[in-house]
């Protein structure tokens, strides 16, 4: 039998090594040099001399864990959260917010240069966010601890599946943060506590809502405890076992306000977590597309109508395309509730664009196009868009890597005119960006 040679992995150094941090990548991870290659370290600032433990070595790069900051930057801040060093939710509280935004901008520009051969100018604007209490949505992890003989409720540790128990979270709204401790008490009172997978919390203009992921059907006593908790905290409670979430009892509809519109949602739907930045994002989309009363607009990856409905008030028509049936139904309902009769919504898996070549919505002509894909981007859509003939296209991105790839595919038919950056998620490596293309 043929045996293939497999080189042994290079032994990692047992002693800590010292490196100097040169810059930050788009995730706000520090980049230094170790043995002539890039070495990535979290929790550091440019210019700092640090002691690190090498945790992974590849041919072109290495990863390391910070052990000590030997020469700190004058810009280094004291993290405002006591759980920062353990919790995986935030990775940059030791960094001024202006530096975070600058690093994200430079990261996006670098990725576009490397992956798309596009030299982005300085962004037209950089929109920042309130540094704390900006999140109206969160997911809490739940795990049974055999040693403590109780259920832990909190967030995942950095680079680990282990849990960090927290009593509060300063980036959540005050109402969501205040639910964490009573939720932990509640879950530990359930006889089916080990079957709880995770908990999602929402706070919008309609009040509080909670989604509990359960691996079975909770017994009657547990349902009574859950309902009592929901009543005590005036919280709409949903349960997800298999399929889509369902209310555990009669609940008041959940909605959020946007542009004077009321958008109804159900826990489990995608929601922008930062309402203030979301409003600014919608404003910029509307300003850049600049629809008139004669324009037909296409909104790809439309969700429950976050962009569709504001655009419909100015355009002749807006067609929304979304891959999840329930969200298509929700978007249709939202248009009806807001008396917007010039909208239409269709379900389509936009990763399989060729399957919809004969769909009515794809046969229409559009003056303006908006797309807001998830982190995987919109690669399958771009060749069709490049030939669409739309006057303007606005691409909203939450992942600069896939945005660079996708924007390069538009170049045969479109010119990138301007872009902007929104710090939707301060203190994290996530970045929201906006790109305007005009037909050549």
Curated annotation (Swiss-Prot):
It holds the Pfam family TRAM. PROSITE patterns: SAM_MT_RNA_M5U, TRAM, TRMA_2. InterPro entries: 23S_rRNA_MeTrfase_RlmD, MeTrfase_TrmA_CS, NA-bd_OB-fold, SAM-dependent_MTases_sf, TRAM_dom, U5_MeTrfase_fam. SUPFAM superfamilies: Nucleic acid-binding proteins (SSF50249), S-adenosyl-L-methionine-dependent methyltransferases (SSF53335). It comes from the Bacteria. It is an enzyme of class 2 (transferase). This is 23S rRNA (uracil(1939)-C(5))-methyltransferase RlmD. It comes from Tolumonas auensis (strain DSM 9187 / NBRC 110442 / TA 4).
């Amino acid at each position: 039998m043929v045996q293939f040679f497999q080189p042994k992995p290079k032994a990692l150094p047992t002693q800590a090594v010292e490196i100097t941090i040169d810059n930050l990548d788009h995730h706000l991870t520090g980049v230094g040099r170790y043995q002539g290659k890039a070495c990535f370290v979290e929790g550091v600032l440019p210019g700092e001399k640090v002691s690190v433990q090498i945790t992974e070595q590849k041919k072109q790069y290495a990863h390391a864990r910070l052990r000590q900051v030997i020469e700190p930057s004058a810009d280094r801040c004291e993290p405002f959260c006591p759980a920062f060093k353990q919790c995986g939710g935030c990775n940059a509280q030791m960094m001024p917010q202006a530096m975070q935004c600058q690093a994200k901008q430079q990261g996006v520009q670098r990725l576009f240069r490397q992956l798309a051969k596009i030299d982005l100018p300085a962004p037209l604007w950089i929109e920042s966010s309130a540094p704390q209490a900006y999140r109206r949505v969160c997911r809490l992890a739940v795990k049974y601890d055999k040693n403590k003989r109780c259920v832990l409720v909190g967030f995942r540790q950095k680079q680990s599946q282990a849990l960090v128990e927290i009593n509060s979270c300063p980036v959540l709204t005050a109402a969501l943060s205040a639910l964490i401790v009573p939720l932990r008490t509640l879950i530990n009172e359930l006889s089916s506590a080990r079957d709880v997978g995770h908990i999602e919390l929402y706070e919008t203009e309609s009040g509080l809502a909670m989604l509990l992921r359960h691996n079975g059907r909770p017994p009657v006593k547990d349902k009574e405890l859950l309902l009592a908790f929901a009543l005590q905290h005036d919280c709409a409670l949903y349960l997800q076992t298999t399929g889509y979430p369902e209310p555990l009892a009669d609940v008041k509809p959940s909605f959020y306000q946007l542009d004077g519109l009321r958008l109804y949602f159900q826990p489990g739907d995608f929601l922008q977590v930062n309402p203030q930045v979301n409003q600014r994002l919608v404003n910029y989309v509307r300003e850049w597309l600049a629809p008139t009363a004669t324009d037909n607009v296409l909104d790809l990856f439309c969700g429950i109508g976050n962009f569709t409905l504001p655009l419909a008030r100015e355009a002749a028509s807006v067609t929304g395309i979304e891959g999840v049936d329930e969200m298509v139904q929700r978007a249709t309902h939202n248009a009806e509730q807001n008396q917007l009769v010039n909208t239409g919504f269709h379900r389509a898996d936009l990763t399989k664009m060729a399957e919809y070549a004969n769909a009515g919505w794809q046969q229409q002509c559009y003056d303006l196009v908006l797309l807001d894909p998830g982190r995987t981007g919109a690669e399958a859509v771009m060749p069709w868009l490049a030939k669409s003939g739309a006057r303007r296209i606005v691409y909203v991105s939450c992942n600069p890597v896939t945005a660079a790839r996708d924007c390069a595919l538009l170049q045969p038919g479109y010119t990138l005119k301007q872009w902007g950056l929104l710090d939707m998620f301060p203190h994290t490596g996530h970045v929201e960006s906006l790109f305007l293309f005009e037909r050549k």
